[in-house]
Amino acid sequence: MPAPDIPEVARTETEPLTRLPFEPITKSHILNCSYDKWHAEYRSSTLKSRIIPLTPEFLSYLREDGIVLPSEIATFPPPETYNNNSTSDGWDEDTDTESDPSEKFSEIHKQIQETITELGGSVVPKLNWSAPKDATWISLKQNSMECNTANDVYLLLKSSDFITHDLEHAFDGCAEDPSLTKENIQYVLVLRKWFKVNPSCEFRCFVRDRRIIGICQRDLNYFDFLFPLIPTLREAIQEYFDRTLKDSFPDRNFSFDVYIPEPFDKVRLVDINPWAPRTDPLLFSWLELLTLSVPPPLLGVADSSSVPPLPVQSSDEDDGADDVEELGWMPEFRLIKKDDPEAYSFSSPQYSAHKMPQEVVEAGASGEGGMREFADNWQRMLSGELEMMRAGEDSSDDEDEVEAIVT
């Protein structure tokens, strides 16, 4: 959704809200949320990772149609390529060989391989803003972004719509600023050390005017043990924010993701996200976050250079009424409840819109012949020559009639 070009204005009942009241989203804000921009500042509390600057040649490879992976081991033609017209070496002169795409970015290819080894043999990749979470369907590791080789990394990156968004649409919805264009983006590949994450311990925090106004879990499943931990988790997140992010991050509005494993006393910064519609509000809505009533700061407007620093202690004349209101307010902490629809698997799986049918994946894995056979059968089904079967039907069951799907 494009960002509005005007700030929020007062509306009456006769003037309904027609768009989310975001302030203009700047390109500089998007750049501030790029991993390489903030990682050095907060490195001590982030997950172990390495950043590799990317070259135009590597970016061109990511943008190319199709998936051609570098050869990791020596490969040999199948026996049927040998015939009477073969050369003295025994191989067909007409055999086509794909050029190795990594030859165009050999240094980066080498860096990726060395970094994977340095980080223990398993990594999770991402670009400046996004990880290829929507492409895990194609991974050899079932529903995982774990990569053990450079080719694992390339396969996920080239199969992801999220990565394409980083490359082609990073500034979509931003206010016009001729001084910043896509050419100003220094794209990087981030490789994080892989470890088995407990999804129940991941949380997204929303910051407005340098104050956390909402916290929620990232994984949309029900975890009953989290509810008694809300005070502990909220306190840990608030203390981390006040100590680390509140006064140092360049923008006053943003969201950030944290990981808090047992014993729930150490906060790890996972990501910083733009305060923009492109960021998933998860258990909140953007309208809630933008219009939520929050007590004003004790001494004026937050993030204002004209506001003096808070005193260490209140004066004797201060009746403390405002302090009570301020100190008594806490950000809402939302979790999936047992009876919430999100807690059950009736809805579509996460990122299902980015996945391909299993039949297509299996056909592609079997090579060109498999795809040709799949396309031929699909055309025959569309023309009525071949019957479509309902899910769960057994084509070998002679007792039941095969019922065609009417579309």
Swiss-Prot record:
Sequence segments annotated as region (Disordered): 73-101
Localization per Swiss-Prot or TrEMBL: Cytoplasm
Main location: cytoplasm
Keyword line: ATP-binding, Chaperone, Cytoplasm, Magnesium, Metal-binding, Nucleotide-binding
UniProt record, GO biological process: eukaryotic translation initiation factor 2 complex assembly
Membership in a protein family: Belongs to the CDC123 family.
Annotated PANTHER family: CELL DIVISION CYCLE PROTEIN 123 HOMOLOG, D123 PROTEIN
Protein name listed in UniProt: Translation initiation factor eIF2 assembly protein
Residues reported to bind ATP: K126, W129, A131, K133, R192, K193, W194, F195, E202, R204, R218, D257, D271, N273
Biased amino acid composition, Acidic residues: 90-100
InterPro entries given in the database record: CDC123
GO cellular component terms, A-Z: cytoplasm
Superkingdom field: Eukaryota
Record-listed Mg(2+) binding positions: D271, N273
GO terms of molecular function: ATP binding; magnesium ion binding; protein folding chaperone
Record function comment: ATP-dependent protein-folding chaperone for the eIF2 complex. Binds to the gamma subunit of the eIF2 complex which allows the subunit to assemble with the alpha and beta subunits.
